[in-house]
Design a protein with these regions (language model features):
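Active-site mouth loops of central-metabolism enzymes
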Residues: 2-14, 63-70, 147-158, 213-216, ...
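N-terminal beta1-alpha1-beta2 module of alpha/beta enzyme domains
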Residues: 1-61, 151, 346-352
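Hydrophobic faces of well-ordered beta-strands that scaffold small-molecule active sites
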Residues: 3-7, 31-33, 58-61, 88-92, ...
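An alpha-helical appendage that flanks or caps ligand/catalytic pockets
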Residues: 107-143, 184-303, 341-352
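Acidic (Asp/Glu)-rich catalytic clusters
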Residues: 24, 46-57, 77-88, 167, ...
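Alpha-helix-loop-beta-strand connector modules within alpha/beta enzyme cores
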Residues: 43-63, 67, 123, 328-346
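Short, acidic/polar
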Residues: 11-23, 76, 157-165, 294-303
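Conserved, mostly hydrophobic/aromatic
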Residues: 27, 49, 80, 120, ...
Length: 352
């Protein structure tokens, strides 16, 4: 299994670059950057990271086809791929928080993602393109350079139709936050529909899962509040899908939690999110995160590998008193040796 990490853009730019260098030295496969509204710009930071690293993979997870025109994304990502040949990938998904961009209304992600990827790939071939899609429109344009490298294109989701789209046209699929076999098998069932539609096989794609990770000192240690908060936001962002799945994911769903899922307001207010965290069953929490002692984390990652997950992209949640860098070092020393493919040392070069 390949083990990668991700930044949400919260740390300073200097600290981000230091984290990328640290992750490379520790043997992580990739350091991805979230494309969140409105944190620090991922394109600027990933471009800088190409100069402060030499081996580690880089890229975006997750971007969307609406916030930036896909032609501009094609231009920027091909430029980045030239800076770090073979190391850059894009993970595209449905996006979120469009309420801050009133001109984006009624997005249909399956259609938008398909159209965006089609246009980007055509532009990367050097073609002059006119594209008249439902969401993506482009008139008689082409890149004014011949890309010397192009990024790999993955699709991320936990919704059935987008997972199927990933199987159909993606070079990889990033499963959104499922960390146990039932969730992975659910996702694989929908990915298989896309593979079948396109007459592809599992050998044609890479299967990844996004997981929230915290290492505890003791099995009975209380789960830190920060990872509860992060995981609950992931759950709530796919409320409809998760409501339909809760009984497949866990056997400890309470009537009170089920009632909350059906009756709570469709909002992100502090009160609603606090109730969600309070009511969330431990089994549901474990289905979307990896929390435990080093031995427990190793066992959980091995169980994911056993059902076909080839890469985990971790969002690291340090415990109180611990920094992200501390957790990366702890993961590298206590987890990676037991589960991860090790990088080839000849891939390194000295970077100032």
């Amino acid at each position: 299994m390949r083990v990668s990490v991700c930044s949400l853009g919260e740390e300073t730019n200097v600290r981000f670059l230091e984290q990328v260098k640290l992750a490379e030295q520790l043997g992580f496969h990739a350091f991805m950057h979230a494309d969140e509204k409105w944190t620090r710009d991922p394109y600027v930071r990933v471009a800088a990271a190409t100069r402060s690293s030499s081996r580690i993979g880089l890229g975006f997870c997750v971007t969307d086809p609406y916030t930036r025109h896909p032609a501009l994304s094609a231009q920027a990502c091909a430029t980045l791929a030239e800076l770090a040949p073979g190391r850059v990938r894009i993970v595209m998904g449905a996006g979120s928080h469009f309420e801050t961009l009133p001109t984006i209304s009624n997005p249909k992600p399956v259609k938008g993602i398909r159209e965006g990827i089609e246009l980007m790939r055509r532009l990367w071939t050097g073609e002059r393109v006119t594209y008249d899609g439902e969401f993506v429109k482009f008139k008689a344009g082409k890149l004014d350079f011949d890309p010397q490298a192009v990024p790999r294109m993955y699709i991320a989701s936990r919704s059935p139709l987008i997972l199927a789209l990933g199987g159909e046209i993606g070079e990889g699929v990033l499963i959104g936050s499922f960390a146990t076999a039932p969730g992975i098998e659910y996702a694989k069932g929908h990915i298989q529909k896309g593979l079948t539609r396109a007459k592809r096989t599992w050998a044609d794609i890479q299967l990844c899962s996004w997981v929230y990770v915290t290492i505890l000192d003791r099995e009975d240690e209380e789960i830190p509040e920060n990872i509860k908060r992060g995981m609950s936001h992931a759950f709530w962002s796919s409320r409809k899908t998760m409501t339909e799945m809760v009984d497949k994911l866990s056997g400890d769903v309470t009537p009170e939690f089920r009632k909350f899922l059906h009756e709570a307001p469709h909002e992100w207010s502090p009160e609603v999110m606090a109730d969600l965290r309070r009511l969330l069953p431990r089994g549901i929490f474990d289905s979307m995160s990896v929390v435990g002692t080093p031995a427990q984390v190793v066992a959980r990652l091995k169980s994911l590998a056993a059902v076909g997950v080839q890469e985990t992209i971790m969002w690291p949640f340090p415990k109180p008193g611990q920094e992200v860098e501390d957790l990366l070092i702890q993961l590298a020393h206590t987890v990676l040796p037991h589960v991860a493919e090790r990088p080839k040392r000849e891939g390194y070069r000295l970077v100032d």
